[in-house]
C-alpha cells in the first residue's frame, strides 16, 4: 500500500492514499433508498463506510454549490450514532469540508439550519422509526431539501469507484466544530411560526418522546408556552429508541392521556420528523386528520392556494371525499416525504404529508416536522376553544384500513413482487369484488425488508377478508419461511 505518514506524538501512522483502501464491502444493490441509507449498524452501516461516504459527499456537495461552506451534522440517540457522525465528519474533513456537529437534535433541525446558513449540505444520523439496532444516514442539499437522486447517485458512484484522492495536504483539510448552541435557532424558528400572542396555559399535554431526538426540545417548548407537560420516554436512551413507544406504538401514550385527564397527546418517532396525536379519549389522530384540520384552518384564512393538499396513496378515501366537500383537492403521490415534497413544488401546494405523520407546510419549512405539526395542532385546539375530539367530529370518519407487513429478506423478490402471478391474480380478484368501495395497495418498503399490504373498504369485514387473503398470498409466494 502506498501511504503518506501522519506524524502524531512521534508516531508514523499510514494514511491510505485513496479512500478505496479502507476495505469496504458494499452490497451489489444500491445503497440509497427512499430516505438515504439505512440498515443494521455494524453490518451495512460501519465506520469505514461512513468515513468514505463523508469523503464523497464532501466532494459532490462542494462541487454542486461551488462554495466553501460547512456541512451540518445532527444525530439521534442511537448507540451507533456517535460513531457514524464522527466518521462522517472525518470523511468530510478529508475532502476539505468544514463540519458543524449539532449533537442530539431532530432531523428537521438539520434541514432548517442547512437552509438558513451558508452550509453546502446537511446530514442526519438516524433510522427514524426503526428499532435501536438499525441506523441511517439522511442527506440534505444546501436548500435543506432531501438530496436529489442525481447527487445521491454521484456520491454512490464515487464510493464504488474508489479511484480518486482529494489532492489536499494537511493545511487544506477541513475542521470539525461542536455547535450544539445552534439548535436554539431552530427552537426560535418553531416559536416564530406560531400565531402571536399564544399561551398554552390550561392545556395539559402528554408527550411520548420515544427515547429519541426530541427529548430536550419538545417538553421545553410546550412548557415555555405555558402547557402542563407529562413526558414519557424522555431520556436520550439509544438502547430503547422506538421500542414499544413513539409514533408507531401509541398504546402507552393513549393510556397516559386517559389516566392523567390530559387534553391531548403527541408521539414522535426517533428523529421527530413525524408525529401522531391522540385525543382526550385516547383515540388516534393520524396524518390524514392533521392535514385535514390544518388545511381547513389555512383554507379559512385564505392561505391555501387552490385549496390543494398533497397526500400519498395511503391517504384514507374518507379524508379525500371530506376534503372535496369543502371545495378542496387532494393530489396523491407515492409513499415517502420526498415524493410529497416534489409534488408540492410541482403543483405549488403549501400543505402536504403522509398518514404516518410526516407533515410539510411550505409557509414555514420544506421538510416534514413532527414538532412543528404538534405545536400547530395544539394551537388550533387552544384558539378554537374546542377539544380535539370536537374538532375531529367535524372532519370525517375514516374507512377501515388494514395495513399488514410481510417480512421478505430477499431484496430481488421484494423489489420485483409485481412479477408474482398468483399475487397479481389475488389483487385483481379483490379489486373486482370491492369495486369503488375500497382500495388495495401493495408495495415494497423503502426502509425495511418488508412488503406492505394495505386494504381499505367501507365495510370492516370486507377489508379484513381481503387483507387476510392478500397477506397469505404474499407470505406463501414471497415471504421468508
From Swiss-Prot:
GO terms for molecular function: magnesium ion binding; phosphoglucosamine mutase activity; phosphomannomutase activity. It comes from Synechocystis sp. (strain ATCC 27184 / PCC 6803 / Kazusa). The lineage of its organism: Bacteria, Bacillati, Cyanobacteriota, Cyanophyceae, Synechococcales. Its EC number is 5.4.2.10. Binds 1 Mg(2+) ion per subunit. Its cofactor is Mg(2+). Keywords: Isomerase, Magnesium, Metal-binding, Phosphoprotein. It holds the Pfam family PGM_PMM_I. Activated by phosphorylation. It comes from the Bacteria. The keyword Glycoprotein does not apply. This is Phosphoglucosamine mutase. Coiled coil: none annotated. The active site is at residue 128. It catalyses: alpha-D-glucosamine 1-phosphate = D-glucosamine 6-phosphate. One of its GO terms (biological process) is UDP-N-acetylglucosamine biosynthetic process. InterPro entries: A-D-PHexomutase_a/b/a-I (IPR005844), A-D-PHexomutase_a/b/a-I/II/III (IPR016055), A-D-PHexomutase_a/b/a-II (IPR005845), A-D-PHexomutase_a/b/a-III (IPR005846), A-D-PHexomutase_C (IPR005843), A-D-PHexomutase_C_sf (IPR036900), A-D-PHexomutase_CS (IPR016066), Alpha-D-phosphohexomutase_SF (IPR005841). Mg(2+) binds at residues 128, 269, 271, 273. The modification Phosphoserine is found at residue 128. Catalyzes the conversion of glucosamine-6-phosphate to glucosamine-1-phosphate. Belongs to the phosphohexose mutase family. GO terms for cellular component: cytosol.
Amino acid at each position: 500500500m502506498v501511504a503518506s505518514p501522519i506524524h502524531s506524538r512521534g508516531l508514523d501512522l499510514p494514511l491510505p492514499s485513496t479512500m478505496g483502501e479502507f476495505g469496504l464491502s458494499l452490497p451489489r444493490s444500491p445503497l440509497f433508498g427512499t430516505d438515504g441509507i439505512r440498515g443494521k449498524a455494524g453490518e451495512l452501516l460501519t465506520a469505514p463506510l461512513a468515513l468514505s461516504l463523508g469523503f464523497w459527499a464532501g466532494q459532490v456537495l462542494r462541487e454542486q454549490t461551488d462554495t466553501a461552506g460547512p456541512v451540518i451534522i445532527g444525530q439521534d440517540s442511537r448507540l451507533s450514532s456517535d460513531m457514524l457522525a464522527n466518521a462522517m465528519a472525518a470523511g468530510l474533513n478529508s475532502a476539505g469540508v468544514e463540519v458543524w456537529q449539532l449533537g442530539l437534535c431532530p432531523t428537521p433541525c438539520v434541514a432548517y439550519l442547512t437552509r438558513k446558513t451558508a452550509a453546502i449540505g446537511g446530514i442526519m444520523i438516524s433510522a427514524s422509526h426503526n428499532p435501536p439496532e438499525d441506523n441511517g444516514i439522511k442527506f440534505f442539499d444546501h436548500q435543506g431539501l432531501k438530496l436529489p437522486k442525481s447527487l445521491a447517485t454521484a456520491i454512490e458512484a464515487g464510493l464504488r469507484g474508489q479511484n480518486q484522492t482529494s489532492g489536499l495536504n494537511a493545511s487544506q483539510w477541513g475542521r470539525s466544530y461542536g455547535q450544539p448552541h445552534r439548535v436554539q435557532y431552530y427552537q426560535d424558528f418553531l416559536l416564530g411560526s406560531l400565531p402571536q400572542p399564544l399561551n398554552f396555559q390550561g392545556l395539559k399535554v402528554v408527550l411520548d418522546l420515544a427515547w429519541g431526538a426530541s427529548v430536550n426540545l419538545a417538553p421545553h417548548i410546550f412548557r415555555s408556552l405555558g402547557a402542563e407537560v407529562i413526558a414519557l420516554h424522555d431520556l436520550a436512551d439509544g438502547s430503547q429508541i422506538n421500542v414499544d413507544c413513539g409514533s408507531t406504538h401509541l398504546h402507552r401514550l393513549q393510556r397516559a392521556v386517559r389516566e392523567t385527564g390530559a387534553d391531548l397527546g403527541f408521539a414522535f418517532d426517533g428523529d421527530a420528523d413525524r408525529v401522531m396525536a391522540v385525543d382526550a379519549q385516547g383515540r388516534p389522530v393520524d396524518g390524514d386528520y392533521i392535514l385535514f384540520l390544518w388545511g381547513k384552518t389555512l383554507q379559512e384564512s385564505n392561505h391555501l392556494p387552490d385549496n390543494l393538499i398533497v397526500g400519498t396513496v395511503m391517504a384514507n378515501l374518507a379524508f379525500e371525499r371530506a376534503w372535496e366537500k369543502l371545495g378542496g383537492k387532494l393530489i396523491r403521490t407515492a409513499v415517502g416525504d420526498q415524493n410529497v415534497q416534489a409534488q408540492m413544488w410541482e403543483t405549488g401546494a403549501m400543505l402536504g404529508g403522509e398518514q404516518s405523520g410526516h407533515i410539510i407546510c411550505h409557509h414555514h419549512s420544506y421538510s416534514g416536522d413532527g414538532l412543528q405539526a404538534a405545536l400547530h395542532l395544539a394551537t388550533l385546539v387552544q384558539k378554537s376553544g374546542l377539544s380535539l375530539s370536537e374538532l375531529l367530529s367535524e372532519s370525517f370518519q375514516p374507512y377501515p384500513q388494514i395495513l399488514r407487513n410481510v417480512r421478505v429478506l430477499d431484496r430481488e423478490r421484494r423489489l420485483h413482487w409485481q412479477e408474482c402471478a398468483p399475487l397479481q391474480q389475488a389483487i385483481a380478484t379483490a379489486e373486482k369484488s370491492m369495486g369503488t368501495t375500497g382500495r388495495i395497495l401493495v408495495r415494497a418498503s423503502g426502509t425495511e425488508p418488508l412488503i406492505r399490504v394495505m386494504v381499505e373498504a367501507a365495510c370492516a369485514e370486507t377489508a379484513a377478508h381481503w387483507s387476510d387473503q392478500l397477506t397469505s398470498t404474499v407470505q406463501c409466494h414471497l415471504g421468508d419461511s
